[in-house]
């Protein structure tokens, strides 16, 4: 998971508009391909390939409004998220839509993309796939794993996991596993045992 700084430098703030002005949640774009998403022939399956960024929320809302029959997302190569707050917003929408998320053969989800994957009410994967986790870092050298377990900076993720169907105990177990699995500068590819232990896939 990538953790973004809460504050930006003053000069950037002077030039910035509100999130709603810069990246509206919905624009009405009806294209089959928007950002990291592409609706396939038949309109029931959408591919996802790339990093989740701030604009991804708009792309997701637009493309699912234009193609409301999309029920499955096939993840290809998804390295993570550059905006964790946006990522959890999209994940909650995915969960509310009762979507199936599948990692394609030879594909992977890492970092924040694993959090996205967990939003699927049905979660499957093909062959030769990987799920990668690690700690986050706040930009000043502080790793999430180095903070006390009751630190409020953990709440974004813990609250998210509960909102997509985990009980609080499972949410805590998985989250702190990811923090201790690898530092933010590295990645831990989950073993088959870990994938089973943390219920990454649905039956």
Question: Which positions does each model-derived feature cover?
Answer:
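Bacterial Sec-dependent N-terminal signal peptides
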Residues: 3-6, 11-34
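STAS-typified acidic loop motif
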Residues: 25-59
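Soluble non-cytosolic domains of exported or imported proteins
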Residues: 51-58, 81-88, 107-111, 125, ...
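Sec/Tat-exported extracytoplasmic proteins
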Residues: 56, 64-68, 77, 94, ...
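Extracytoplasmic/secreted envelope proteins and their assembly/folding machinery
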Residues: 57-64, 87-91, 95, 114, ...
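Short, glycine-/small-residue-enriched flexible loop/hinge segments at domain edges that mediate gating
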Residues: 68-86, 100-106
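Charged, glycine-interspersed solvent-exposed loop segments at helix/strand-loop junctions
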Residues: 72, 96, 140-203
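Glycine-rich beta-to-alpha active-site loop
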Residues: 95-138
């Amino acid at each position: 998971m990538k953790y973004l700084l809460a504050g930006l430098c003053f000069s950037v703030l002077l030039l910035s508009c509100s999130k709603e002005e810069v990246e509206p949640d919905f624009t009405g774009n009806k294209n089959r391909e928007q950002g990291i998403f592409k609706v396939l022939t038949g309109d029931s399956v959408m591919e996802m390939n790339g990093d989740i960024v701030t604009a991804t929320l708009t792309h997701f809302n637009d493309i699912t409004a234009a193609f409301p029959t999309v029920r499955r997302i096939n993840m290809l190569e998804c390295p993570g998220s550059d905006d964790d707050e946006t990522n959890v917003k999209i994940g909650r929408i995915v969960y509310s839509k009762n979507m199936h998320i599948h990692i394609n053969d030879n594909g992977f989800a890492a970092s924040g993309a694993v959090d996205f994957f967990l939003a699927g009410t049905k979660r499957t994967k093909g062959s030769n796939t990987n799920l990668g986790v690690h700690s986050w870092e706040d930009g000043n050298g502080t790793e999430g794993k180095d903070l006390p377990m009751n630190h409020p900076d953990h709440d974004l993720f813990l609250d998210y996991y509960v909102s997509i169907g985990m009980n609080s105990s499972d949410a805590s177990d998985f989250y702190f596993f990811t923090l201790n699995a690898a530092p933010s500068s590295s990645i831990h590819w989950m073993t088959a045992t870990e994938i089973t232990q943390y219920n990454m896939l649905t039956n």
